[in-house]
């Protein structure tokens, strides 16, 4: 049965993150794509019993995506009026919830300074669309995630980075990875799980050597292929979850070679 528990051999990763939240510090989770950063944020949200509002950054991210937007609604009297619909930042601030900013280094640098007051000691924001001054309610926390060396990422502004405390989140392996597969996928065959772990080790080696992209060795992909391995041959599961996502034929062939070696 799948669950949302975050597992890491280094227990200080989760414990430190929880302590930083209790100190009201902004947390920047730094690590390769698919290493479990979002899973860590979700587990912190569950553990602290605090809902999480997520922003998925891209070059198209704008102030409305962060703060909200104006729209026309019909009120109780049947007449129309302009109202402002709060976005994830303002919702999290008003409710004292967690704000999770995923892939923060995918956003254009000029988009994020609007959050400066939210991220420093003021914990305050003046909504440029309404003029409303929003003060963060007790319990409000900010967690951001940054993918290191991923295609499309931009250098993170130093002034922005200085508003966070950084926690490195690396890939998991060995018996810890085995536990994750058992807990978060439908696969229970120990022999197959060990083969998948060895296969993943080979993928990570190729990632470090620059032969394949990081996404191919991600925990997400591993969980997906483990699920599919319960209903189809492992070779086809890998084809569906990893190989077919890649555009580069050399990367595809490198993974096919690893499949032949491990299965």
Swiss-Prot record:
**What InterPro entries does the annotation carry?**
AAA+_ATPase, ATPase_dyneun-rel_AAA, CbbQ/NirQ/NorQ/GpvN, CbbQ_C, ClpA/B, P-loop_NTPase
The residues that the entry says bind ATP are: 31-38
A molecular-function term among this protein's GO annotations: ATP hydrolysis activity
Q: Which family does it belong to?
A: Belongs to the CbbQ/NirQ/NorQ/GpvN family.
Q: Which SUPFAM superfamilies match?
A: P-loop containing nucleoside triphosphate hydrolases
Extent of the signal sequence = none
Q: Which SMART domains match?
A: AAA
Q: Which UniProt keywords apply?
A: ATP-binding, Nucleotide-binding
Organism, by scientific name, is Staphylococcus saprophyticus subsp. saprophyticus (strain ATCC 15305 / DSM 20229 / NCIMB 8711 / NCTC 7292 / S-41)
- Protein's recorded name: Uncharacterized protein SSP1341
């Amino acid at each position: 049965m799948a669950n949302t528990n975050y597992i890491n051999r280094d227990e200080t990763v989760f414990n430190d993150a929880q302590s930083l939240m209790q100190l009201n510090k902004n947390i920047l989770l730094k690590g390769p794509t698919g290493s479990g950063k979002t899973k860590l944020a979700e587990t912190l949200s569950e553990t602290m019993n605090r809902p999480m509002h997520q922003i998925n950054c891209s070059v198209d991210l704008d102030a409305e995506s962060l703060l909200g937007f104006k729209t026309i609604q019909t009120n109780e009297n049947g007449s129309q009026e302009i109202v402002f619909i709060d976005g994830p930042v303002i919702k999290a601030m008003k409710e004292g919830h967690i704000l999770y900013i995923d892939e923060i280094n995918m956003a254009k640098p000029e988009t994020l300074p609007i959050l400066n007051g939210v991220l420093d000691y003021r914990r305050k924001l003046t909504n440029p669309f309404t003029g409303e001054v929003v003060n963060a309610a007790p319990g409000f926390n900010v967690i951001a995630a940054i993918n290191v060396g991923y295609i499309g990422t931009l250098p993170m502004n130093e002034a922005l980075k200085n508003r966070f405390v950084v926690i490195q989140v690396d890939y998991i392996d060995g018996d810890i990875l085995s536990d994750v597969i058992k807990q978060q996928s439908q696969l229970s065959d120990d022999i197959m799980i060990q083969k998948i772990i060895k296969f993943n080790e080979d993928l990570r080696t190729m990632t470090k050597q620059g032969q394949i992209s990081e996404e191919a060795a991600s925990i997400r992909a591993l969980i997906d292929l483990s699920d599919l391995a319960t209903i189809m041959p492992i070779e086809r599961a890998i084809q569906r979850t990893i190989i077919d996502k890649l555009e580069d034929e050399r990367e595809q062939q490198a993974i096919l070679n690893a499949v032949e070696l491990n299965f």
